[in-house]
């Protein structure tokens, strides 16, 4: 899970500071177009939770709040050890979006029940699984209408995260 990743990666970054840029890229590339993170990052990409009929404890949901703190710590670390290292990444399209089969409900629905905010899209889940069989981990990345992996810059990735928190705030 994300906490374990951060605790391990933070120690690794202190031992091997040159790894930090790759860690930041991996972290950001696991976020979705709507600014959230799936369940966990793995060596094969990332996973998301699904509802399992036989498991009453199964649950779906995005992760996001504590990942923002972890990302901030990584950004502070790279700035301390390699000042300006990520400057070009702000404008160069080196990043991708995770494609997770969750649909965020409308604001009106979220206000009605702020504890039930997403819908699992089983058809999209199956489509992504088929793409993963054909393309490997890239099958779970957001694509353009032509089927190419959609690339963005770091500024967009960071703004998506900020906007997700601001626009999905329920008073």
What is the meaning of each model-derived region?
Residues 1-171:
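Acidic, mature catalytic/reactive cores of soluble proteins
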């Amino acid at each position: 899970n994300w906490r374990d990743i951060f605790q391990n990666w933070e120690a690794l970054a202190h031992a091997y500071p040159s790894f930090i840029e790759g860690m930041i890229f991996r972290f950001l590339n696991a976020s979705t177009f709507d600014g959230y993170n799936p369940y966990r990052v793995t060596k094969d990409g990332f996973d998301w939770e699904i509802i399992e009929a036989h498991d009453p404890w199964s649950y779906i949901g995005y992760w996001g709040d504590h990942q923002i703190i972890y990302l901030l710590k990584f950004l502070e670390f790279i700035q301390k050890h390699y000042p300006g290292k990520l400057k070009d990444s702000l404008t160069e399209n080196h990043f991708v979006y995770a494609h997770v089969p969750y649909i965020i409900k409308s604001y009106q629905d979220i206000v009605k029940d702020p504890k039930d905010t997403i819908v699992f899209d089983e058809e999209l889940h199956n489509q992504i699984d088929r793409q993963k069989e054909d393309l490997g981990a890239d099958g779970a990345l957001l694509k353009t209408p032509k089927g190419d992996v959609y690339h963005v810059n770091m500024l967009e990735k960071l703004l998506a995260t900020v906007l997700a928190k601001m626009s999905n705030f329920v008073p």
